[in-house]
């Protein structure tokens, strides 16, 4: 279910402050965050945000097509390595 339009999108306050500070300085640097639940808003476009996936921070460059999505969607937490090969020797 989607979020109600009466409510504003959730963005962590510390993340919003960092982005606004960089926008006023017109600087570009990597912003490290653990807030995977924050929604991407238009002021974030052009910044690189390092999103925590549970083990490390993955840098993600924000483009206009990402607006409205959550940060956690772009940092996968599970690394699927494929199913085990069919080994007939172990079945005997």
From Swiss-Prot:
Record-linked InterPro entries: Ribosomal_uS19 (IPR002222), Ribosomal_uS19_bac-type (IPR005732), Ribosomal_uS19_CS (IPR020934), Ribosomal_uS19_SF (IPR023575)
Segments traversing the membrane: none
Chief location of this protein within or outside the cell: plastid
GO CC entries: chloroplast; mitochondrial small ribosomal subunit
Matching PROSITE patterns: RIBOSOMAL_S19
Presence of the UniProt keyword Ribosomal protein in the record: yes
Xref: Gene3D superfamilies: 30s Ribosomal Protein S19, Chain A
SUPFAM superfamilies xref list: Ribosomal protein S19
Tagged with keyword rRNA-binding: yes
Protein keywords: Chloroplast, Plastid, Ribonucleoprotein, Ribosomal protein, RNA-binding, rRNA-binding
Entry's Gene Ontology molecular function annotations: rRNA binding; structural constituent of ribosome
Localization annotation: Plastid, Chloroplast
GO BP, sorted A to Z: ribosomal small subunit assembly; translation
Function comment: Protein S19 forms a complex with S13 that binds strongly to the 16S ribosomal RNA.
Similarity comment text for this entry: Belongs to the universal ribosomal protein uS19 family.
Protein name: Small ribosomal subunit protein uS19c
Lineage per the UniProt record: Eukaryota, Viridiplantae, Streptophyta, Embryophyta, Tracheophyta
């Amino acid at each position: 279910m989607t979020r109600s339009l009466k409510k504003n999108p959730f963005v962590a306050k510390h993340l919003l402050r960092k982005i606004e500070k960089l926008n006023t300085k017109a600087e570009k640097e990597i912003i490290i965050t653990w807030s995977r639940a924050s929604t991407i808003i238009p002021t974030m476009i052009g910044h690189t945000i390092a999103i925590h996936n549970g083990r490390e921070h993955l840098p993600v460059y924000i483009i206009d097509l990402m607006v409205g999505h959550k940060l956690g969607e772009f940092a996968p937490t599970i690394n699927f390595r494929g199913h085990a090969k069919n080994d007939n020797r172990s079945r005997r």
